[in-house]
């Protein structure tokens, strides 16, 4: 499996090469998209990208956990967690090793 990580710069470069915007415009576009997605998630909205997947925020309630080293019970505070659920197409694409681009 590849050890490379796709970064904002990689996305910006791809927009530059494939869409034809300037490097600056490409970077601004990527930032704008990520900002819109982040803002929606902060508001508690889901972000659904067709054929890719859905990002959503879930509220987890307080509960009692256990310290694995000591066995001592510790309270786990309520929190919001970000989840991603890939679409069926994305699951298939990953399972097929990206052969069906």
Swiss-Prot record:
GO cellular component: cytosol
Keyword field: DNA recombination, DNA-binding, Transcription, Transcription regulation, Translation regulation
Transcription regulation found in the keyword field: yes
Database matches in SUPFAM superfamilies: IHF-like DNA-binding proteins
Molecular function, one GO term: DNA binding
Pfam families in UniProt: Bac_DNA_binding
Keyword Coiled coil recorded: no
GO biological-process terms attached to the record: DNA recombination; positive regulation of metabolic process; regulation of DNA-templated transcription; regulation of translation
Subunit structure: Heterodimer of an alpha and a beta chain.
Family: Belongs to the bacterial histone-like protein family.
Role noted for this protein: This protein is one of the two subunits of integration host factor, a specific DNA-binding protein that functions in genetic recombination as well as in transcriptional and translational control.
Protein name according to UniProt: Integration host factor subunit alpha
Lineage: Bacteria, Pseudomonadati, Pseudomonadota, Alphaproteobacteria, Rhodobacterales
Originating gene: ihfA
């Amino acid at each position: 499996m590849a050890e490379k990580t796709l970064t904002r710069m990689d996305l910006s470069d791809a927009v530059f090469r494939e869409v034809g915007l300037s490097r600056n415009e490409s970077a601004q576009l990527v930032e704008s998209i990520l900002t819109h997605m982040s803002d929606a998630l902060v508001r508690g909205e889901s972000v659904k990208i067709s054929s890719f997947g859905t990002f959503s925020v879930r509220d987890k309630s307080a509960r009692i956990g256990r310290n694995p080293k000591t066995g001592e019970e510790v309270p786990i505070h309520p929190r919001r967690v970000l989840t991603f659920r890939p679409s069926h197409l994305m699951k298939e694409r990953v399972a097929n090793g990206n052969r069906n681009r």
